[in-house]
Amino acid sequence: MALQLKHITKTFGNGDAQTEVLKNINFSVNQGEFIILSGASGSGKSTLLNILGGLLSPSSGDVLYKGENLFSKEVDKTSLRLNDIGFIFQSSHLVPYLTVREQLMIVAKEAGIKRKEAKDKAQRLLNEIGLSHRLDVYPHLLSGGEKQRVAIMRAFMNEPKIILADEPTASLDADRATSVVQMIKAHVQTKNMIGIMITHDKRLFEYADRVIEIQDGKIEL
């Protein structure tokens, strides 16, 4: 089950003030594949990721998933974002008044997962990243690396089919950045997900199955 982009364009503005940010983007990503989107700031990477996540509509073109266009009227984009797509951002965006375990459980609650099941699953995921001793700790007591690991596990909580990561390692040192990318890739492969990550860090390219370079809104061949 691939995620396919066909002739995606995105234009902002009106009349003479229009700016074409994405220009005829075409590629597909298969299940179990982890790709990196790279390119200069302002090249259109984040706009493309927002389109893939259903947060922004393309001006033209199709994004096909499960054989359906994500932007057809029949597709429930709210349900899709909740159940099929996991987002990881540059900032962890943890809720300050929730403990580490609660950060994960609130996502499960929104998806209708029973509390006992959610609690057990949160425990397993946090054990996996070495934070079992931090279950009841609040975000202000966590290091930057710990916060980002919690954010990653939060994205995996509902077992999404697609993981979209926008510069998740930008604020981390080299060792922590490598650890985070290895963690994301491992989940993508073992759970047969589709993984797409934006990064400028060329040291991380070796962990991708493919690197897609975007320049001036176009894929650089």
From Swiss-Prot:
Cellular compartment(s):
Cell membrane
**Family matches, as InterPro entries:** AAA+_ATPase, ABC_transporter-like_ATP-bd, ABC_transpr_LolD-like, MacB-like_ATP-bd, P-loop_NTPase
Q: What is its main location?
A: membrane
Q: Give the GO molecular function terms.
A: ATP binding; ATP hydrolysis activity; transmembrane transporter activity
> What is the recorded membrane topology of this protein?
Peripheral membrane protein
Concerning Pfam families, the annotation shows: ABC_tran
Q: Which GO terms describe its cellular component?
A: plasma membrane
The UniProt record gives the binding positions of ATP as G39, A40, S41, G42, S43, G44, K45, S46
Ordered alphabetically, the record's keywords are: ATP-binding, Cell membrane, Membrane, Nucleotide-binding, Translocase, Transport
What sequence ranges are listed for the domain ABC transporter? 3-221
Q: Which domain of life is it from?
A: Bacteria
Q: What is its EC number?
A: 7.6.2.-
- Family annotation (CDD domains): ABC_MJ0796_LolCDE_FtsE
Q: Which family does it belong to?
A: Belongs to the ABC transporter superfamily. HrtA family.
Q: Which PANTHER family match?
A: HEMIN IMPORT ATP-BINDING PROTEIN HRTA-RELATED (PTHR24220:SF666), IMPORT ATP-BINDING PROTEIN (PTHR24220)
Function per UniProt? Part of the ABC transporter complex hrt involved in hemin import. Responsible for energy coupling to the transport system.
Quaternary structure and partners: The complex is composed of two ATP-binding proteins (HrtA), two transmembrane proteins (HrtB) and a solute-binding protein.
Protein name in the entry: Putative hemin import ATP-binding protein HrtA
Its source organism is: Staphylococcus haemolyticus (strain JCSC1435)
What lineage is this protein's organism placed in?
Answer: Bacteria, Bacillati, Bacillota, Bacilli, Bacillales
Q: What gene does this protein come from?
A: hrtA
